[in-house]
From Swiss-Prot:
GO terms for molecular function: ubiquitin protein ligase activity; zinc ion binding. GO terms for cellular component: cytoplasm; cytosol. One of its GO terms (biological process) is innate immune response. Disulfide bonds: none annotated. InterPro entries: TRIM/RBCC, Znf-RING_euk, Znf_B-box, Znf_RING, Znf_RING/FYVE/PHD, Znf_RING_CS. Belongs to the TRIM/RBCC family. Residues 125-169, 204-235 form a coiled coil. This is Tripartite motif-containing protein 74. CDD domains: Bbox2_TRIM50-like. A zinc finger (B box-type) spans 84-125. SMART domains: BBOX, RING. It holds the Pfam family zf-B_box. Keywords: Coiled coil, Metal-binding, Zinc, Zinc-finger. It comes from Homo sapiens (Human).
């Protein structure tokens, strides 16, 4: 018989219904549903009494829960070498698989089911990470647009500076030629005019140089911000969400 199962379907089958992470020390209740041992303990505090299954609500004997060996074998067979251990909740020691939209923090399944985040809107970490990556891409696009504007401003300032310097050279040449035709009595007037045009030019050039320096500084800061955003995109889901949320709150 041929079997065809998608990766998403397989991932759903291997997830604990409580913590929404891959089973760890899976136990099967008498009703047939399986959960992480840690999740069942957190739910009922111990397994020596009756346990109400969170899926079918059937009350079963917790002490009769047996390890789901077949499921553990499947998970172990599919686990990649060197897979990092997931970050866990400090309260329940379960994987941080959810993101509380109200409190803007990472939580585990039990935090959302029974803890302080009960009834809060929550989203799977992978979905939040995808959403934040989209926001990061939009921010990156805005950054590129700002860089383009700064580059255009710098090009315009450089062009204006060159034009003013060239025009100043032409005016100076015209003035020199005109004054060469005059006699000595007008030499002082010639010098005064040249100094005037020179001072005016220096003032304009100094102003443009200052604007150029400011624009180039802005471009460098935008480039640094671009580098930081690119580095955020390479972080793992949890580090990325923590750092992105920290940056956005500022």
């Amino acid at each position: 018989m041929a079997w065809q199962v998608s990766l998403l379907e397989l991932e759903d089958w291997l997830q604990c219904p409580i913590c929404l992470e891959v089973f760890k020390e899976s136990l099967m209740l008498q009703c047939g549903h399986s959960y992480c041992k840690g999740c069942l303990v957190s739910l009922s505090y111990h397994l020596d009494t009756k346990v109400r299954c969170p899926m079918c609500w059937q009350v079963v004997d917790g002490s009769s829960s047996l390890p789901n060996v077949s499921l553990a074998w499947v998970i172990e067979a599919l686990r990649l070498p060197g897979d990092p251990e997931p970050k866990v909740c400090v309260h329940h020691r379960n994987p941080l698989s959810l993101f509380c939209e109200k409190d803007q923090e990472l939580i585990c399944g039990l935090c959302g089911l029974l803890g302080s985040h009960q009834h809060h809107p929550v989203t799977p970490v992978s979905t939040v990470c995808s959403r934040m990556k989209e926001e990061l891409a939009a921010l990156f696009s805005e950054l590129k647009q700002e860089q383009k504007k700064v580059d255009e401003l710098i090009a315009k300032l450089v062009k204006n500076r060159t034009r003013i310097v060239n025009e100043s050279d032409v005016f100076s040449w015209v003035i020199r030629r005109e004054f060469q035709e005059l006699r000595h009595p007008v030499d002082e007037e010639k010098a005064r005019c040249l100094e005037g045009i020179g001072g005016h030019t220096r003032g304009l050039v100094a102003s443009l140089d200052m604007q150029l320096e400011q624009a180039q500084g802005t471009r460098e800061r935008l480039a640094q911000a671009e580098c930081v955003l690119e580095q955020f995109g390479n972080e793992d889901h949890h580090e990325f969400i923590w750092k992105f949320h920290s940056m956005a709150s500022r």
